[in-house]
Swiss-Prot record:
Keywords: Disulfide bond, Secreted. One of its GO terms (biological process) is proteolysis. Pfam families: Trypsin. The gene is LOC113510063. This is Phenoloxidase-activating factor 2. It is found in: Secreted.
């Protein structure tokens, strides 16, 4: 018999074929490997949404010493649409100078996860030319990374919808994110990735609901937005700006398409007011154009 002492008992078996499926958009509904703690309400499992990334800003610990020790400050969420390209909201990244993207993260307080996270620096960003900080129209950006992420059970790409395709009203989708504040020991943020299930809301219904808020009765929902949520207590503030809203692809169990990017909301899951998301299908042409402009094939995120 093999008398060698067992290695670290948390080492998982080699990933099975199932975990590394070809193509975009595969959610690991039961997580990757195993979990030691029981599932908590609203927590994503390790590796459940492998396209989910954290966007970090690199800042000096001491402003007087800009070349000294650096701190990773959490800016918001994003999604991997290609091993080297991240989709996010423009208002989080428009003014930031040095950004870094972390894929495969789950619990931000520990590095003991079974598969490591991967960090890459952002070398180029594309902000939509019509992005407007005041009203957040066209709140979309692409971040191009210094090197591709390595695909792994906890790191994968999401699919994007065909141009102008919207998820049908009532479709139950997932938003995910780590909450606000900063990465690291000082910050108060969601330590473990959170998820919230929200139904897609028809645009007219959404506009009517939003007119009952402080936006007033003449509010017009811009074509670059879509809506989801509005169920009491299902709080989309958990999903950060920039984070993906993913919806199931019909007839392909376990496969998801990114219909929205978390943009803004009024209050938080109160009074049945839906959350507002950037409409990804409506901006698919822009995404394809910018990605192809940097020599990358849009086929990676096409299903």
């Amino acid at each position: 018999p093999d008398r060698r002492p067992p290695e670290d008992p948390i080492t998982p078996p080699p990933p099975t074929k199932e975990e590394q499926r070809a193509g975009c958009g595969w959610r690991n509904e039961n997580g990757v490997g195993f979990r030691i703690i029981g599932d908590k309400d609203g927590e994503a499992k390790f590796g459940e949404f492998p396209w989910m990334v954290a966007i970090l800003k690199i800042e000096p610990v001491n402003d007087q010493d800009p070349e000294g020790q650096k701190l990773n400050v959490y800016v918001g969420g994003g999604s991997l649409i290609h091993p080297q390209v991240v989709l996010t909201a423009a208002h989080y990244v428009a003014t930031a100078k040095t950004l870094r993207v972390r894929a495969g993260e789950w619990d931000t307080q520990t590095t003991k996860e079974i598969y490591p996270y991967q960090d890459r620096d952002v070398t180029h960003k594309e902000i939509h030319k019509d992005f407007n900080k005041g009203n957040l129209f066209y709140d979309i950006a692409l971040l191009f990374l210094s090197q591709p992420m390595e695909m792994a059970p906890n790191v994968g790409v999401v699919c994007l919808p065909p141009r102008n395709e919207r998820a049908e009203a009532g479709t139950r989708c997932f938003a995910s994110g780590w909450g606000k504040d900063k990465f690291g020991k000082e910050g108060r943020y969601q330590v473990i990735l959170k998820k919230v299930e929200v139904p897609v809301v028809d645009r007219n219904t959404c506009q009517d609901q939003l007119r009952k808020t402080r936006l007033g009765r003449h509010f017009m929902l811009h074509s670059s937005f879509m809506c989801a949520g509005g169920e009491p207590g299902r709080d989309t503030c958990r999903g950060d700006g920039g984070s993906p809203l993913v919806c199931p692809i019909q007839y392909e169990k376990g496969r998801y398409v990114q219909s929205g990017i978390v943009a803004w909301g009024i209050g938080c899951g109160e009074d049945r007011t839906p959350g507002v998301y950037v409409d990804v299908g409506n901006l698919r042409d822009w995404i394809d154009d910018k990605v192809a402009g940097r020599g990358i094939e849009p086929t990676v995120y096409t299903y």
